[in-house]
């Protein structure tokens, strides 16, 4: 029989993956050519009863890499002025180095094997993280090179909504549209949403799996 404490551990919930919620704000849609301007990450924890909860938060404004495209439409959409000195922006290297270091520690502390990005429309955020890590020559990237947990897809299944704000409201999570398109706010709300989706599945009896309980 499977040890219930293992099933209630973060390492046992997602096949050894350590989920980290990420959101990025950018100056366009092309991860290779357009600037990464802001990134936030929220790590997750599981309590002894097996409920998923947000843990630590990291947030950085990021300097555009040399030669980066800055699409005016994207800047108008997210309201970011890359030239504003009050942003306190750091290099892609410094931002990702700090996030990767915290994530590697979380992997070790939680007994997991590798990190996996959780994001809303995750391919977008994943592509920018991977491109920035390559530009910064960061060799110890803890994230899976292509697998993700996409809260847009999960919300479509569970809640019938795919837009972050609408999914949060459908899940009973307040969403302030005036704060949307801030990487920090969107990451915090996405983390709450992912936890709600995972925990709701548990409440409905979907986890632990019956087969796991009867082994």
Swiss-Prot record:
Organism encoding this protein: Yersinia pseudotuberculosis serotype O:1b (strain IP 31758)
Residues reported to bind Mg(2+) 2: 23, 25, 181, 186
Domain Exonuclease: 20-194
InterPro entries, alphabetized: Exonuclease_RNaseT/DNA_pol3 (IPR013520), RNase_T (IPR005987), RNaseH-like_sf (IPR012337), RNaseH_sf (IPR036397)
The name this protein goes by in its record: Ribonuclease T
Cofactor: Mg(2+)
Residues that, per the record, bind Mg(2+) 1: 23
NCBIfam families per the UniProt record, alphabetical: RNaseT
Keyword terms, alphabetized: Exonuclease, Hydrolase, Magnesium, Metal-binding, Nuclease, tRNA processing
An example molecular function term from Gene Ontology annotations: 3'-5' exonuclease activity
Gene3D superfamilies named among the record's database cross-references: Ribonuclease H-like superfamily/Ribonuclease H
GO biological process, one term: DNA replication proofreading
EC id: 3.1.13.-
GO cellular component: cytosol
Function summary: Trims short 3' overhangs of a variety of RNA species, leaving a one or two nucleotide 3' overhang. Responsible for the end-turnover of tRNA: specifically removes the terminal AMP residue from uncharged tRNA (tRNA-C-C-A). Also appears to be involved in tRNA biosynthesis.
PANTHER family: DNA POLYMERASE III SUBUNIT EPSILON, RIBONUCLEASE T
Catalytic residues of the enzyme: 181 (proton donor/acceptor)
Quaternary assembly: Homodimer.
Cofactor note: Binds two Mg(2+) per subunit. The active form of the enzyme binds two Mg(2+) ions in its active site. The first Mg(2+) forms only one salt bridge with the protein.
Signal peptide from the UniProt entry: none
SMART domains, sorted: EXOIII
């Amino acid at each position: 029989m499977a040890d219930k404490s293992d099933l209630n551990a973060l390492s046992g919930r997602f096949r050894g993956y350590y989920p980290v919620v990420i959101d990025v704000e950018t100056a366009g849609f092309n991860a290779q050519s357009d600037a990464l301007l802001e990134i936030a990450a929220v790590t997750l924890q599981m309590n002894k009863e097996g409920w998923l909860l947000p843990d630590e938060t990291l947030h950085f404004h990021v300097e555009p890499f040399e030669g980066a495209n800055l699409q005016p439409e994207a800047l108008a959409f997210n309201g970011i002025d890359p030239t504003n000195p009050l942003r306190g922006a750091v290099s892609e290297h410094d931002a990702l180095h700090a996030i990767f270091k915290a994530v590697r520690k979380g992997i070790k502390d939680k007994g997991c094997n590798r990190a996996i990005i959780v994001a809303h429309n995750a391919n977008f955020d994943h592509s920018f993280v991977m491109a920035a890590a390559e530009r910064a020559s960061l060799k110890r990237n803890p994230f899976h090179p292509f697998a993700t947990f996409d809260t847009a897809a999960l919300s479509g299944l569970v809640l019938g909504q795919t837009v972050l704000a609408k999914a949060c409201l459908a899940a009973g999570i307040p969403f302030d549209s005036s704060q949307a398109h801030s990487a920090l706010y969107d990451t915090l709300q996405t983390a709450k949403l992912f936890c709600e989706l995972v925990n709701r599945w548990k409440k409905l009896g979907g986890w632990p799996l019956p087969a796991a309980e009867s082994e």
